[in-house]
């Protein structure tokens, strides 16, 4: 459960997000809005990116999220993916997962974790020995997104914010993505917030709520998902 009260985000004194009062309980939620309105900013600010100044209040499963350091937010169960995942030379995909699981006090059985990693990679159609390849280095956009899906499965957070998880994926990969996101939420007490403009993904996920951000940094949250389909057909000004 994530609840924001008059949550405002500023960069260099400029307001990007203005007095957002939103609630995200267990289930699937979609965030939409024109380019540049702060959809990615919302995720980064919640995760504790120091480039953003925040005001207001954010409660995460009963805890004051804004009082936590970034690593504490991760340990509390918050996970975000990125529009453009960063490559890290010299660090393999599995080494990254292994270290993350240690840091988050997750299962540290190397043999079991490696087996699970390889199974997830196979499910997603990634190359053999994907675990040994360097993190996001010489990987396509779609492969980077699949890598983040493996991370989501293995780190098993309480709440995940995925920034355009469908980017770079073909139709078959989108189908697998939907299956895995559904499986994640179906574990119970899991919250998934997705930033997407892809009609196929939104239709298949059938989200519980829709949040629309506008160019003034305001937000409207609704359970009327038909609005999403109208936007996809006619645009934000339609």
Role assignments for model-derived ranges:
Residues 152-153:
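ABC ATPase C-loop
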Residues 164-165, 172:
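Walker B catalytic motif
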Residues 213-238:
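Conserved beta-strand-loop-alpha-helix hinge in the C-terminal portion
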